Amino acid sequence: AIKRPIFVTGLVRTGTTALHRLLGADPAHQGLHMWLAEYPQPRPPRETWESNPLYRQLDAQFTQHHAENPGYTGLHFMAAYELEECWQLLRQSLHSVSYEALAHVPSYADWLSRQDWTPSYCRHRRNLQLIGLNDAEKRWVLKNPSHLFALDALMATYPDALVVQTHRPVETIMASMCSLAQHTTEGWSTKFVGAQIGADAMDTWSRGLERFNAARAKYDSAQFYDVDYHDLIADPLGTVADIYRHFGLTLSDEARQAMTTVHAESQSGARAPKHSYSLADYGLTVEMVKERFAGL
């Protein structure tokens, strides 16, 4: 059984990745490692991963990607061994906002907005049961901006879920969101560039927040916790402690130490955040963004 799993969600670039990896560092928790999202199977002992051919294949791909795109690691560090979003599990059912975040696909976006995601989350749950077979006693910690679009399906599948929503003024992150989409898809399309990326991002993410806010109002507020991005950056471990306190969880000394190590690693070397961008690059202004997201 999967009991009281933690789901981190929020707009892209609001600190979801940093918070997810901090929470996942707790030895009492388990998360979705990139290679197991790609190749779902019962999680083998950590010391055997480097000899697993599937792990080695994906690790080699990321090593090549890092070498060919040295600037990308500072935007969003990815590796076969790292905790990652559960978008790959939802993609198994073709229900994922990642598609419209990486291409101009208005007909797909329209189709997705009318779908019931519940079967996708049931499959998501079965994947977690498979992957966590050897660690059934550990609490799952998961993260995906797609959860904004399907809270009802998530709660129907995981009725005791603990949901953490991250927040940051949208006008300060929209350019960053667009820049990430641009760098991820460089050379893929002549359509999904510049102002088209900006327009699509505005449509997609305003719709997601509208849906999430409307759905959230129906559930027990005790199952939700809000994190301000600036609080997370100023005091990462203090923010985590507040989350544990709200949900009645125990934060052990071992967990604190592991989180301290993870935070230090995230600020160093290739992982250190490096990002420059402008709203004007994507046909947007601060006023346009504020107007679209007013009240969300």
State where each predicted segment sits.
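Short His-Asn-centered micro-motif
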Residues: 9-11, 141-145, 229
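Nucleotide 5′-phosphate-binding alpha/beta core
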Residues: 1-7
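PAPS-dependent sulfotransferases, especially Golgi type II membrane carbohydrate sulfotransferases
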Residues: 1, 104-121, 128, 132-135, ...
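PAPS-dependent sulfation machinery
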Residues: 38-140
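Flexible, glycine/threonine-enriched loop-and-boundary segments that flank and lead into catalytic domains
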Residues: 127, 133-160
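Conserved phosphate-donor/acceptor-positioning beta-strand/loop module used by diverse small-molecule
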Residues: 143, 154-179
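Glycine-rich phosphate-binding P-loop
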Residues: 7-26
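Post-Walker A helix-loop "phosphate-sensing" segment adjacent to the P-loop in P-loop NTPases
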Residues: 25-35
